Amino acid sequence: MTSTLPTRSFNTSRSRQIFARAQQLMPGGVSSPVRAFKSVGGDPVVFDRVAGAYAWDVDGNQYIDYIGSWGPAIVGHAHPEVIEALRRALEKGTSFGAPCVLENELAERVIEAVPSVEMVRFVNSGTEACMAALRLMRAYTGREKVIKFEGCYHGHADMFLVKAGSGVATLGLPDSPGVPKAATSATLTAPYNDLEAVKALFEQYPDSIAGVILEPVVGNAGFIPPQPGFLEGLRELTQKYGALLVFDEVMTGFRISYGGVQAKFGVIPDLTTLGKVIGGGLPVGAYGGRREIMEMVAPAGPMYQAGTLSGNPLAMTAGIHTLDILRRPGTYEYLERITEQLATGLLQIAQETGHEMCGGYLPGMFGFFFTAGPVRNYEEAKRSDLQKFARFHRGMLERGVYLAPSQFEAGFTSLAHTEADVERTLEAAREVLRTL
């Protein structure tokens, strides 16, 4: 492959100026920790605008974006159909605080697509969805203990900040100050892909476990897929012990297939949490599942949960039009093809340039680690060469490729990415890996 990358200066002076001021105004200068580039060094670039597969910073640098707003931008940033629909919705108002027909329309699409969902409740974030799902599994079973997996991230609620992934993993935090022991005393943990560890917990607490929650494909400790039989084994164990199985598909829902991991792998949980894609880039979350479970949620039932902006017309509009684009023929075949081209290309170039690297992909989602692997859980992910990743990230950034600024985050492709974008990315990767 002959490099055709243009020579470009990489001036980020305006970004540095803005970030310096931001640090005086906001903790760490950001509204979410991973954006601060703490694990890769240097100051973050400050975006000015996005469109399609690209982002531009305030200094005018253009990037091929493989973060996609951390997952929502699966049809590409600022898709014209979504933007036009939002313009029309804005003219009717930004929030009603009352029932809205758009809630019905998005709910019908979610229920049609996701096998486990017979009823759905909209909220405002993935964190909120997971908080409600946890409360619901406890309310339905009358039990308190919950099993989660090391490196899986379910938002920043107190009860989930135990061996969590995402920004917690990025910063190397074992948990978080300010979380009382009582909040996590009923949270049990096991290594991801370790069915025997889960069996042992059920044997120890056979009548006390309300359920198991997990990212069925991990994206918040890097990209880690389930081993054959793992999801099926969890389904069998939860049914055996009368516990609920909850798939956190905030990241994977409508991404690796229209029906998420559960549709692609054929393992159906009792409850599912969603977010990101279903809001088309606007703040949103949802949880849903079997009718008999969901009817416990107020006002139909006794389990209380509410939200001022839940089901707001802008998020519903963006979600409806995003899902309608995703339903078109060939969508996921294209995502699989473009993601395979990128992920396999990276591994091949790493091998050719003498670097240990392992990784994988599913449609629209990929990841890699600077280690020989295999990586089947968070402990194995931590074997990655983080200093090498940081240098690789910086080199790619300077060449116009925007990757997640953490080894412990998955990457995302979109319908807007082209084969030419991927080839350009691989050319940049070859240049950088030759220098490491």
Curated annotation (Swiss-Prot):
GO cellular component, one term: cytoplasm
UniProt keyword Isomerase present: yes
Keyword Isomerase: yes
Predominant subcellular localization, coarse grouping: cytoplasm
EC number, UniProt record: 5.4.3.8
Catalytic reaction annotation: (S)-4-amino-5-oxopentanoate = 5-aminolevulinate
Pathway participation: Porphyrin-containing compound metabolism; protoporphyrin-IX biosynthesis; 5-aminolevulinate from L-glutamyl-tRNA(Glu): step 2/2; Porphyrin-containing compound metabolism; chlorophyll biosynthesis
Record keywords: Chlorophyll biosynthesis, Cytoplasm, Isomerase, Porphyrin biosynthesis, Pyridoxal phosphate
A family per Pfam: Aminotran_3
Lineage top rank: taxon: Bacteria
GO terms for biological process, alphabetical: chlorophyll biosynthetic process; protoporphyrinogen IX biosynthetic process
GO MF annotation, one: glutamate-1-semialdehyde 2,1-aminomutase activity
N6-(pyridoxal phosphate)lysine carried by residues: 276
Top EC class, one word: isomerase
UniProt subunit comment: Homodimer.
Stated family: Belongs to the class-III pyridoxal-phosphate-dependent aminotransferase family. HemL subfamily.
UniProt xrefs under PANTHER family: GLUTAMATE-1-SEMIALDEHYDE 2,1-AMINOMUTASE, GLUTAMATE-1-SEMIALDEHYDE 2,1-AMINOMUTASE 1, CHLOROPLASTIC-RELATED
Record-given protein name: Glutamate-1-semialdehyde 2,1-aminomutase
Gene: hemL
